[in-house]
Every structure is written in structure tokens, then in C-alpha cells.
A protein has these predicted regions:
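Minor-groove-contacting beta-hairpin "wing" of winged helix-turn-helix DNA-binding domains
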Residues: 206-210
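Short, amphipathic alpha-helical interaction segments positioned at domain boundaries
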Residues: 212-227
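Short amphipathic alpha-helical interaction segments
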Residues: 180-195
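A short, conserved structural fragment
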Residues: 195-205
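Solvent-exposed, charged/polar functional surfaces in cytosolic regulatory/catalytic domains
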Residues: 73, 193, 197, 223
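C-terminal scaffold of the Radical SAM
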Residues: 1-181
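Residues at alpha-helix caps and immediate loop-helix transition turns in enzyme cores, especially N-
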Residues: 17-18, 186, 220
Length: 227
């Protein structure tokens, strides 16, 4: 299972240039493609150039046209758009990433690696970020981790922001089972607004984004957050 990665939204990039990149990616015939828009992170050279107005960030309309073209071309080539940034041939979804999106427990090995467990309490932990410190603690036969016990509100927010990224969406029965009726009612009150706007849909017991909703997914997810 070979996966390619594609980044788009570079300064001055045109839709025609992205089209060429997508067509080249398709020609490689890999089983999987991850595609991400360029982000300007504070402290990086790109961010500094942006602040100095030496480069220009892709405007929202152009970005949406690029993303729409990406979806159209990848699905036309037989790839399943199973997560906001991921496409796969049938049967080749990323099992690794899917575990994060569906709350499967995992162990992280290495500096700054994160782990997640559900019993005896739901906890997220992470190793020391400094590689030298991490190696030293392992050599001494001990571990040094920070951790966070996740309450229901945090778990709910995490589930919303991960599950809604996928084509499967949120399993409504899981919300009732894991969080109770009050959380479920809160979810559905917000969902009804977006369903009426054709931004979300309920199908086979799952609440998911529509194609229209994908384009404003961050805004929709923020509407569901418990603060």
C-alpha cells in the first residue's frame, strides 16, 4: 500500500499548475493520496515572508476551486474521498490514521510521541520532546511522560473534530452510549441547523458532512464544540 502526499495552495500557484500535479499523482497509480493545503506556521521562513508581504497567501475563493478540482479529479479516477484530506482506492484506506479518527487506543514510541488509552480512565500522554532527554530516560530504564485525563467534554470535542472529517461521520448511537442523552440532544440541536442548510446529512445512523459542508468544515465543527 503506497501513499503519496500532495500539498497545494502555494504562493502564486494556479489551478492549472495544481491540475498538472493531480494528474501526475494519478498517473503514479498509488493506492492512497493525502492532500493538504499549505499552512503558514509562526516562526517559519514562509510565515516571515508573508508578514513582510514578499509573498501572498492563496485567497479563499482560489483555494476552494483548487479543493473542489482535487475532489472531482481524484474521485473520477476511482479514488474514495474517505476523509477531508485523504483519498484511497477501494480497500486501501489508511488503517493507521483511521485508528485516531475512531478512538482506537494506541502507544507512541519515540521522542514527543503520543499515546491514548481508554481504561481504566481515558488518558492522553506524550513523551519528552527533547531527543537527548528521551534517550537518556530510556537508557536509565525509566520513562518520562506528561499526561492528561480527558473528561467527557474534551472527549466529545475530540470525537467531533475527528469523526466529522471522515466520510462515515459520527455514529449517533455511539454518542448516546458514550456520552448520554444530554450530549446527544445537544448534538442534534446543532445538527438540525446544518441539515436544513444541506451542509450535513444523516444516513444509516451516521451524521456526516455533505459536499457543501466539506467546504466550510472548520466552521461547522466549531459550532459543535462544547466550551
Amino acid at each position: 500500500n503506497i501513499s503519496n502526499a500532495l500539498m497545494f495552495g502555494f504562493p502564486n500557484e494556479t489551478t492549472q499548475e495544481l491540475q498538472q500535479d493531480i494528474e501526475h499523482a494519478i498517473s503514479l497509480n498509488a493506492e492512497h493520496l493525502s492532500a493538504y493545503s499549505l499552512m503558514y506556521e509562526e516562526g517559519t521562513t514562509l510565515y516571515r515572508l508573508l508578514q513582510q508581504e514578499k509573498i501572498k497567501e492563496t485567497d479563499e475563493d482560489t483555494y476552494l476551486r483548487m479543493y473542489e478540482m482535487l475532489i472531482d479529479k481524484m474521485t473520477a479516477a476511482g479514488y474514495e474521498h474517505y476523509e477531508i484530506s485523504n483519498f484511497a482506492k477501494p480497500g486501501f484506506r489508511s488503517r493507521h490514521n483511521s485508528s485516531y479518527w475512531h478512538e482506537v487506543p494506541y502507544i507512541g514510541l519515540g521522542a514527543a510521541a503520543h499515546s491514548y488509552r481508554r481504561k481504566p480512565e481515558v488518558m492522553r500522554s506524550w513523551n519528552a520532546a527533547d531527543i537527548h532527554k528521551y534517550i537518556q530516560t530510556i537508557t536509565e530504564g525509566r520513562t518520562e511522560q506528561e499526561h492528561e485525563i480527558l473528561n467527557k467534554e474534551t472527549r466529545y470535542n475530540d470525537l467531533i473534530t475527528t469523526a466529522l472529517r471522515t466520510i462515515d461521520g459520527i455514529t449517533l448511537e455511539d454518542i448516546k452510549k458514550e456520552f448520554g442523552d444530554s450530549f446527544y440532544r445537544t448534538l442534534m440541536t446543532e445538527a438540525d441547523k446544518h441539515i436544513a442548510r444541506q451542509q450535513m446529512v444523516i444516513k444509516d445512523g451516521h451524521l456526516a458532512l455533505t459536499r457543501k459542508g466539506l467546504y466550510i468544515s472548520d466552521d461547522i465543527m466549531s459550532d459543535f464544540m462544547l466550551v
